[in-house]
Amino acid sequence: MATKKIRCALIGSGNIGTDLIYKLKRSAVLEPVWMVGIDAASEGLQRARDLGLKTTAEGVDGLLPHVKADGIQIAFDATSAYVHPENSRKLNALGVLMVDLTPAAVGPLCVPPVNLREHAAKLEMNVNMISCAGQATIPIVYAVSRVQPVDYAEIVASLASKSIGPGTRANLDEFTYTTSDALVRVGGARRGKALAVINPAEPPMIMRNTINCLTDDEPQQARIIDSVLSMIEEVQQYVPGYKLVNGPVFDGRRVSVFMQVAGLGDYLPTYAGNLDIMTAAACRTAEMFAEEILAGTLQLTPVKEAA
C-alpha cells in the first residue's frame, strides 16, 4: 500500500515555486497537487501542468474553493512579501499551514538545523524561511554563537543575476531587513547586517557567501572549527551542494567563513544554489510538520481572524 502523503499547494509560479515542484515530487511525505499563479501563460504554470499538477492563474482566490475537496494541508508561498500576509490569512482560515518563502516574516523565522524541532513542537500555522542568504549563512553564525557570544555578524551573499526573478528583485529591501534581523534572532549575534550582491557575470557565478563574526572575547578556535564543520554536515543532509571554500579564518576577534552553494539543477542550473537552499529548507520544514500530522501528533486548526 502506498504511504499516505500530505497534499500541498504551491503559490507563485516563478523560479522558486517551479523548483519546489521537483523537491516535493521526491518527498516521501509531501505531494504537490496545486500550483497557483497570476499569468496564465507563465512557464511555471505550464511546467506544473506538464508534471500533473492542477493550476489556476487567478491567484490564491482561484485555489480557495478547491482546498477542502483536494485535501490541501500545507501551502508554500513563493510570491512576494507584499501579498503574503493576505494569502496566509485566507489559507490559515481554512486550516492550511503556510510555509512562507517570501521575506514577509509574518510567522516565526525558521532555519532547519538551528530551530526546526522547536517550531514543529509548537502549533504554528505560518513559518517563515527568511531568505536564501539567511538559509546559507545563519547556520554558520549560530555555529559560532553557540560556542561563545558574538557581538556582530555580517554576511555578504553573491547571487547570479539569472537566478533572481522579479519577485526577489521587488523584495530586496525586505530581504535585507529580514535576513539582518534573523542573524540576531536565530543566529544568536547581538547585532547583524546582511548584504546581497547580484552578479550579472556570464557564465553565471555559483552562489557564494562570506560570513564574518566578531566575538566578544578571543575566539576559542578549536571549538569554533568543530562547531562550524559539524553544522556544515547538518546542512549538507538537505543541501548536498553546501560547501566550505575557506575557513574558519581567525584575525583577532574576527571569525570569517567562506561558503559556496551549488544547486541540484532541478529547474535552474546548478549555479542557482540560492534557489536550492531555499526550496530544500522549505521542503525539509514542511516534511517535519507532515511527519507530525501523519503520526497524529499535530492537528492543523483553522485560524480565526482577530476581532
UniProtKB/Swiss-Prot annotation:
Documented EC number(s): 1.2.1.10
Protein name: Acetaldehyde dehydrogenase 2
Residues where NAD(+) binds: 13-16, 163-171, 274
Cross-referenced SMART domains: Semialdhyde_dh
Keywords, sorted A to Z: Aromatic hydrocarbons catabolism, NAD, Oxidoreductase
Pfam families from the UniProt entry: AcetDehyd-dimer (PF09290)
GO molecular function: acetaldehyde dehydrogenase (acetylating) activity; NAD binding
Biological process per Gene Ontology, one example term: catabolic process
Organism: Methylibium petroleiphilum (strain ATCC BAA-1232 / LMG 22953 / PM1)
Active-site residues from the entry: 132
Enzyme class name: oxidoreductase
Catalytic function, reaction form: acetaldehyde + NAD(+) + CoA = acetyl-CoA + NADH + H(+)
Family affiliation: Belongs to the acetaldehyde dehydrogenase family.
